[in-house]
Swiss-Prot record:
Catalyzes the initial step of the lipid cycle reactions in the biosynthesis of the cell wall peptidoglycan: transfers peptidoglycan precursor phospho-MurNAc-pentapeptide from UDP-MurNAc-pentapeptide onto the lipid carrier undecaprenyl phosphate, yielding undecaprenyl-pyrophosphoryl-MurNAc-pentapeptide, known as lipid I. It catalyses: UDP-N-acetyl-alpha-D-muramoyl-L-alanyl-gamma-D-glutamyl-L-lysyl-D-alanyl-D-alanine + di-trans,octa-cis-undecaprenyl phosphate = Mur2Ac(oyl-L-Ala-gamma-D-Glu-L-Lys-D-Ala-D-Ala)-di-trans,octa-cis-undecaprenyl diphosphate + UMP. One of its GO terms (cellular component) is plasma membrane. Its cofactor is Mg(2+). The chain crosses the membrane at residues 3-23, 53-73, 78-98, 118-138, 143-163, 174-194, 200-220, 226-246, 251-271, 316-336. PROSITE patterns: MRAY_2. It is found in: Cell membrane. Its main location: membrane. This is Phospho-N-acetylmuramoyl-pentapeptide-transferase.
Amino acid sequence: MFLTLIAAIISFMVSAFTMPYFIKFYQLKKIGGQQMHEDVKQHLAKAGTPTMGGTVFLLVATAVSLLVSLFSIKNTQSLALISGILSIVVIYGIIGFLDDFLKIFKQINEGLTAKQKLALQLAGGLMFYFLHVSPSGISSINVFGYQLSLGIFYLFFVLFWVVGFSNAVNLTDGIDGLASISVVISLVTYGVIAYVQGQFDVLLLIGTMIGALLGFFCFNHKPAKVFMGDVGSLALGAMLAAISIALRQEWTLLIIGIVYVLETSSVMLQVSYFKYTKKKYGEGRRIFRMTPFHHHLELGGLSGKGKKWSEWQVDAFLWGVGSLASLLVLAILYVF
């Protein structure tokens, strides 16, 4: 526990110290920044804000985790577990980096196409499964203490879980500070679970990422001076999925990650309903003012018809939802 605390502090300090230099480099080179939705007018002023800040906190968290692990953990099984989780973080970080690079440096608006991104994510998920999950012999899901055996179909579950939550966190990263603190809340919860289980290797990894993310948040809160980009959000979502698998608490991510589930569900519902109503009535209709869900809140509160919410109000609401959901999971696991 003490080692985790030290690693978290080091990650925070290095991340917070390095980020201003990253921002300054971005500005000096006059690199194109984040593009904004025209429908949310209060976001237009953010156009050009440096992005790809996830590169910094991912490098910091990965480096600190590896260094501390190599010097303090002698158990080869623990090292393999840490390297397994870090591998999926790095792979998805590279995918996100490539997507951001194409958007910003090559001026390709959509970056990777949806098919290209999905293909790379599936390839990364397959590597994670065959190199780190399959050798462990895991083929079942822990659902409220009951082991649901999936056999070979566990492969498809892992792919769905990792790809799904990486994209879900990516959708959540739409306003200042929302994704970074939402992920911190999720990681703190998994940190408690790892501590109770005695999985201090996973706890170390969680602690370093929390520290690095908090260092990043110093510059990502409203008004944000930097965004994490796909390089950060895709990697963080994959990390949460991998941790839930490593701790054998896969089901908990549906509740701990309720914010990401809400954001993704809102997009899926909106698109499906729009297509259905367009086919039936000749014109597309919407359930939400705008998706993902945080934009709906910005444009008119919960009902979508009330006063506009500030980014701080949206952040506070969704952070609160995530915190309550996380407490519910801990209560289910250790109280009831």
